């Protein structure tokens, strides 16, 4: 069936197109003769650029249009940055493949300062993420943190125009766009715990499409998949969208999973942290158990405030 064209639904930002092209190249390498086509689309998250993400309903903001295209048969797969993928999928769709993780860290970018520590009090730092905001505010309450929207190029332009003294971006995105020279300081997980799935590319498709799933199988990276499974299980139990102050990062150390997580008040005034270690086979159970601990230790109240009074169940 290699005469059939495999269609990839993708957003049109340079980073989204890089991810789609990456998957296209991997598929063509794994299956010589396979025809793969990109189907670029505009999502709601690409259109609403004048409002902080947390205020426009973060769940699925960048994926719903892509999912509709798959359900209607206009596309076979959708390629996502894993940190943008909601915890729930529409009926008939699922996450079937997670590619090898790139750099999961956040990156400090500035034209005048080499690190967060060098920023003078009152410096303006841009980020679109409540997770980054809460961690930065906790360590540097003297900084002014302002919302920053748009694709990577737009955000860098705003920095270069002097609207911000520094901005925080995902290291993987900068590296994929060959902009790693802009990184002044990669932030360790201890400095800024990454988002769920950060640095990994995920592939969603129809669950009844065995042909496509077979084609995708060689692209799955087992170690990344188990790490992201633990992170996502924790996030699911917390009922976290992609725009809540939740950080989660799993590492595999000698076959054992080490999962760290945090939930923070956006202003940095409260931070609930926890960690778990256990066998990789228990990835989901570890994630759920850690989420329960966080909820019991104050995360429930923090998230309820973020959700405007709608407490997680």
Swiss-Prot record:
Transferase found in the keyword field: yes
Catalyses which reaction(s): 4 porphobilinogen + H2O = hydroxymethylbilane + 4 NH4(+)
Cofactor note (record): Binds 1 dipyrromethane group covalently.
UniProt cofactor(s): dipyrromethane
GO term, biological process aspect, one: protoporphyrinogen IX biosynthetic process
Pathway field: Porphyrin-containing compound metabolism; protoporphyrin-IX biosynthesis; coproporphyrinogen-III from 5-aminolevulinate: step 2/4
Superkingdom field: Bacteria
InterPro entries, per the entry: HemC, Porphobilin_deaminase_cofac_BS, Porphobilin_deaminase_N, Porphobilinogen_deaminase_C, Porphobilinogen_deaminase_C_sf
GO cellular component entries: cytoplasm
Listed CDD domains: PBP2_EcHMBS_like
GO molecular function: hydroxymethylbilane synthase activity
Alphabetical list of PANTHER family matching this protein: PORPHOBILINOGEN DEAMINASE
Subunit comment: Monomer.
Extra facts: The porphobilinogen subunits are added to the dipyrromethane group.
Function, as annotated: Tetrapolymerization of the monopyrrole PBG into the hydroxymethylbilane pre-uroporphyrinogen in several discrete steps.
Protein name stated in the entry: Porphobilinogen deaminase
Taxonomic source organism: Klebsiella pneumoniae (strain 342)
